């Protein structure tokens, strides 16, 4: 908790204002509510697909995200419980208004700021410029996401203000418009940090996810078991410490900065850790006058 009080309000905004794209293995959103919109789990929120004359949404052969339970036990991975969808890309043309898209419209329990995370699967012909639009109270913000890397986990887009309820100015849209010939992939979209849902010792913490350790956030983010549970569930304290570096290594595996390790190919250039366990002690040193 102590280090998060520095990292979230100060360190991450400072780095982002300097132009960095920041990833943190712990939850970064202090919003206690969490709404997930997904094709596999219909609820009060809305997931919608619209095809074009040339392209139709299809289920991939790769497993995707699905939240089929409220609480997850050790080793359970929500990113292997569902499906993901894909569609052929189309280049933008002035006269072509027949673009295909997917929409995620959440039903939010309260007005406030929510982090927006998207997910997808990296496919053999994924494109590097998947176009996402986030509709929020401040307008519309566009993102180009490289789906050639980072598939099968949560990808943070930003934190935005949304109104309570379900409306057409609070949603995420993925278009099949691209400058490349290939496919874009759609899976779940998450709004808000939420509460911890990883069971340890037969119960959950009852805390907001941002107050929990990286071990539990990484499991919710679809990391492989060995990334967050090197001690096989027998020592969460040690696992939590190791999860932070293990997650970064897995995300960057296969990239130009970490070519020797298998992973998601995200080119993470630098890692930084803030420690709060430094201390000091009083030491008395006796220096005697040399004998002549």
Where are these regions (language model features)?
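Residue-level detector of conserved catalytic or cofactor/ligand-binding positions
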Residues: 285-291
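Extracellular carbohydrate recognition and processing domains
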Residues: 137-166
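Short beta-strand-plus-loop segments that form exposed binding edges in beta-rich domains
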Residues: 172-182
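Catalytic-core regions of hydrolytic enzymes
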Residues: 2-34, 198-284
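Short beta-strands within extracellular/lumenal beta-sheet-rich domains
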Residues: 82-108
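Low-complexity, Gly/Ser/Thr/Pro- and Asn/Asp-enriched, turn/coil-prone segments
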Residues: 25-90, 180-198
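A short beta-strand element within beta-rich, extracytoplasmic domains
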Residues: 100-124
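Short, surface-exposed beta-strand/strand-loop-strand elements in extracellular ectodomains
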Residues: 124-140
């Amino acid at each position: 908790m102590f280090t998060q009080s520095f990292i979230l309000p100060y360190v991450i905004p400072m780095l982002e204002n300097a132009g960095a794209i920041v990833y943190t293995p712990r939850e970064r959103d202090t919003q206690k509510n969490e709404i997930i919109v997904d094709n596999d789990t219909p609820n009060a929120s809305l997931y919608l697909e619209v095809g074009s004359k040339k392209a139709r949404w299809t289920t991939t052969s790769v497993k995707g995200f699905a939240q089929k339970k409220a609480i997850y036990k050790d080793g359970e991975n929500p990113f292997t419980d569902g499906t993901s969808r894909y569609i052929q890309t189309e280049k933008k043309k002035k006269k072509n208004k027949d673009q295909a898209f997917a929409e995620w419209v959440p039903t939010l329990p309260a007005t406030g700021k929510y982090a927006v995370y998207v997910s997808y699967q990296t496919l053999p012909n994924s494109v590097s410029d998947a176009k996402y639009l986030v509709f929020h109270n401040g307008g519309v913000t566009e993102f180009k996401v490289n789906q050639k890397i980072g598939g099968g986990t949560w990808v943070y887009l930003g934190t935005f203000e949304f109104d309570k309820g379900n409306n057409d100015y609070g949603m995420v849209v993925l278009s099949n418009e691209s400058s490349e010939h290939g496919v874009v992939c759609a899976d779940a979209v998450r709004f808000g940090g939420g509460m911890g849902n990883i069971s340890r010792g037969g119960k959950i913490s009852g805390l907001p996810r941002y107050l929990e350790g990286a071990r539990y956030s990484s499991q919710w983010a679809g990391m492989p078991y060995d990334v967050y549970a090197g001690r096989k569930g027998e020592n969460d304290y040690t696992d939590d410490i190791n999860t932070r570096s293990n997650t970064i290594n897995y995300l960057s595996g296969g990239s130009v900065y970490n070519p020797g390790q298998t992973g998601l190919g995200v080119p993470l250039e630098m890692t930084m850790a803030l420690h709060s366990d430094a201390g000091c002690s009083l030491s008395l040193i006796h220096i005697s006058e040399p004998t002549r």
